[in-house]
Amino acid sequence: AIIKPKYQLTYEDANEILELEPKEEVELIEIKNLLEKSITFRKKQGAIIFESPNSKIKLYKERVVLNKLEKTISQIIVAESMILMGHVTSLFIDKYNLAAAFRIQKLNCKPSEILNRYDDSDIKYIILKQYMGRSYITTKPGIHESLGLKMYVQCTSPLRRYLDLIIQ
């Protein structure tokens, strides 16, 4: 198949469209609504949704500088679409008993215990990340607890990750 995009949509353009919701852009709005349902589903399954902004901490002239980078709606839907694709792909692989590298993660704590213990949202998510178990790869499907999914594969970045290329 040959894909010929009509125009390039930047993150900024997408954010503006998703904020204004013009009738001409119904497809993008429908995609956002679908992915919001995916997030809601994962939350009900115990997913940890990091709602705090991404922070970059740097040491500059013996001072610690903290830059907070707020997540935009377009970044959230791109991330969620990648997660959804990985989940749907894992279901397909499992259904047809295909060989694949499943990503599994077990949590070393109950997230609610940490999230309820601290008031500062930045601190709670930093501490929570320390208690989360590392994900690992196996050939058998299993739960990815922090994503709230019964199975998951990474498959959306074949140029950056060789396993994604194999799965594709």
Where are the regions that the model predicts?
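Electropositive polyanion-binding surfaces
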Residues: 1-168
